[in-house]
Amino acid sequence: MRVNVIKGDRCTGKTTQLQAIQEELKAQGIEVPIIIGERFTTPYFLNLISDQVLAGATHFLADDCTQFQIKAVQDLVAQGRNARLPITFIAHLVRQA
């Protein structure tokens, strides 16, 4: 699993960049919704990622993620094979400004 963290100050185009990734995936025939990270607790956020992996998804898109959510995902990636996440799965996370 790979993590792409999109950072920046307010109004710097982070969400626009995430939407561009979504459109690029859509052009490839891959439909991926954008979830709003701040609406979920960190454990539930991790469960959302796990659910997507189990469903066979290859990408996860999230806007307005807390630094705790991003750290938790990075910790999951650091576990490597123990986390049982496919290396082809990519999480695109926009950090809250």
Feature annotation, model-predicted:
Residues 3:
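Walker A (P-loop) ATP-phosphate-binding motif of ABC ATPase nucleotide-binding domains
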Residues 6:
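Hydrophobic anchor at the beta1->P-loop junction of P-loop NTPases
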Residues 10:
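The conserved Walker
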Residues 13-14:
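Conserved glycine(s) of the Walker
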Residues 17:
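Hydrophobic positions on the alpha1 helix immediately C-terminal to the Walker A/P-loop
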Residues 49-59:
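Short basic/glycine-enriched coil/helix segment immediately N-terminal to the Walker B
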Residues 61-63:
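Hydrophobic residues in beta-strands of the RecA-like P-loop NTPase core, especially within AAA+ ATPase
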